[in-house]
Amino acid sequence: PDVNIIGTIATGLPNITSSKSNASGDKVDRTIAYVILLAASASQLNPSLDPSSGLKVAAMPVYTAASQLCIDELFEKVEQNKLTRNKTLKPDYRKVYGKLLAAIGYPTRALKSPLFVGTGERDIDVPPKSQLALVREACDAGTKVEAHLYAGLDHSGTVNPSFKDSITFARKVLAGQPINVQCDPTPQ
C-alpha cells in the first residue's frame, strides 16, 4: 500500500537475527522463551517440522507448553527448567529455523525515514547488546537513527521515560526538522 512513513519510534527493539545476548551459553537465559516460541510457530506453519531437529531434549517441556502460555509464564518456565542456550539449542538451530528467522527479520537496515530507538540498559527481555547492534547496523546502512540508552531501566520500565525523547523526535519529524542522530548512545 501507499503509506508515507515519515519516521519510526521503537522501544525494546527486537533483533531476532542477532547472536548478541547478555547471557553466555551456560547461563539461564529467559530470552530463550522467544526462541522456543519461534520454534512452536514454525511447527504450526510446517507440521512436518520436527522440533527436536533444532531443540535439545531439555527444551521440549517448555516447547510443549509454549502454545498454552503467555510470554511472562513462558519466561518463568524457562527459568524453572534452568534453560541455557547450550541446553536448549542444537548446533544447527539457525539452519533448521532459518526460513522463519529470515521471514520475521527486518528486510533492510536502510530506512528512508528517521528511526528513534529507546533501550533500557537493564533490559532482560530484549538484550541491549542486540538492540544496539541493530542500531549500529541501521546507522551503517545510512539510516538516520536517534538512539537512547536509559540508565538502570528494564524493558517495560523504558517506555514511559522514553516519551520525553520520542515525542521530541516525533515533533521534529512532523515539522521536517533534522533529528539528533545518535548511533552509539551512552546511558542517560
What do the predicted segments below correspond to?
Residues 111, 116-123:
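Short beta-strand/loop motif that positions the catalytic acidic residue
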Residues 107-111, 141-142:
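A structural signal for short secondary-structure junctions
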Residues 129:
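The serine-hydrolase catalytic nucleophile loop
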Residues 22, 93, 98-99, 132-188:
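C-terminal catalytic histidine-bearing segment of alpha/beta-hydrolase fold enzymes
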